[in-house]
């Protein structure tokens, strides 16, 4: 709820350092719009797993990992989210010293992922690990820790490797 979240603006340091062009990487310098998931209506899928990175008398660093989803018609899209917070406590108030969120769409090879002769990976790091064959007919890429191969001539996508349970 953006109205409830408006209270958080006092903790943000929105400025030109924030990249407001993607939801993959959101920081303390991003706009309020980006920090509050822009126009995505996310639903929590899992409870956050909290990892205490540092804990001092007045400061602490924490990392949260969890899954969210969005819905488009009958299709659901899933995302892995990792958030990092560094906070300082004083008797008067708490200060957010740093915030970083990385959101990565879980690639679903069974969904409609083709558009304009491209494979749409969704919200991911712009530097996708990819390798092309010598003839250019086949290329392999990694998405969500899974290895895929795409045969351009046959227009076939195949998952080559993933860990058990993925």
Please state what every model-predicted region is.
Residues 1-38, 115-156, 162-165:
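Core segments of small alpha/beta cavity-forming domains
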Residues 51-52, 84-86, 138:
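Short, surface-exposed charged micro-motifs
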Residues 44-47, 81, 124-126, 133:
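Residues that act as N-cap/strand-start positions at coil-to-secondary-structure junctions
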Residues 29-75:
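Surface-exposed, charged secondary-structure patches
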Residues 70-72, 104-107, 149, 158:
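A short local loop/turn or secondary-structure capping micro-motif enriched for an aromatic residue
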Residues 64-68, 100, 143-145, 154:
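A mature extracytoplasmic/lumenal domain signature
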Residues 9, 59, 91-94, 136:
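Non-catalytic accessory regions used for complex assembly or targeting
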Residues 75-128:
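Short beta-strand edge/turn micro-motifs at domain boundaries
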């Amino acid at each position: 709820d953006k109205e409830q979240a408006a209270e958080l603006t006092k903790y943000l340091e929105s400025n030109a350092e924030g990249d407001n062009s993607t939801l993959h990487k959101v920081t303390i310098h991003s706009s309020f719009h980006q920090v509050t998931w822009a126009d995505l209506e996310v639903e929590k899928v899992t409870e956050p797993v909290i990892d205490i990175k540092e804990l001092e008398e007045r400061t602490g660093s924490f990392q949260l990992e969890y899954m969210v989803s969005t819905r488009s018609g009958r299709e659901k899209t899933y995302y892995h989210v990792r958030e990092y917070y560094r906070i300082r406590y004083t008797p008067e108030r708490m200060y957010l010293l740093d915030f970083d969120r990385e959101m990565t769409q879980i690639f679903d090879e069974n969904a409609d992922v083709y558009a304009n002769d491209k494979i749409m990976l969704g919200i991911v790091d712009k530097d996708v690990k990819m390798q092309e064959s010598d003839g250019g007919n086949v290329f392999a890429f990694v998405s969500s820790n899974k290895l895929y191969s795409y045969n351009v001539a046959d227009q076939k996508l195949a998952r080559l490797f993933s860990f058990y349970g993925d």
